[in-house]
Amino acid sequence: MSDRVNTTRLQEMARAYTVSAVLYAALDVGLFTHVSNGCVKEADLANATGLRRIDIDRLVSCALSLDLLDWDGEELRNQADVEAYLVEGKERYAGPWMMFTRPDVPGWFEMTERMRTPKSSRLGMYDDLTVESARQYHKATSSLSLIHI
């Protein structure tokens, strides 16, 4: 073990939002579902997702670097947890839960400003809960109940 101090951990924190962004983009275009359904080459994924080839290359490269995807010879495949939980139509699909807090992201980047306001910030979603947002919340949390099946 090295006692050398470096910035690696801090850099990972500073760029952690990119991990969420890649996951959201992959779910937006159904990347993992397409791979599971046999689109295992980038050209096929570009056609299936409607993304430009350069952008599917970028998304796949990011997903590979995050261990969401892997290579099986010349073909892409989902990692086991991705296959189990992020393929739409599968029994344990947890996509709604993964995406549920996405609207909260901008608020986290306003954290400093919110803490500096004279009025205390509200925590939680319940003050602004609508019938539609309650339905989305129920859909998201019910997808969680399937995870342990």
Across the structure, where does each feature detected by a protein language model lie?
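Conserved Class I S-adenosyl-L-methionine-dependent methyltransferase catalytic core
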Residues: 13-17, 25-26, 33-34, 54-146
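Short N-terminal amphipathic alpha-helix/helix-capping patch enriched in small hydrophobics
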Residues: 27-28, 41
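Short, Lys/Arg-enriched N-terminal segment that forms or immediately precedes the first helix
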Residues: 6-20
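Short acidic, hydrophobic short linear motifs in intrinsically disordered regions
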Residues: 38-48
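Basic/polar N-terminal segments that are highly enriched at the extreme N-terminus
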Residues: 1-5
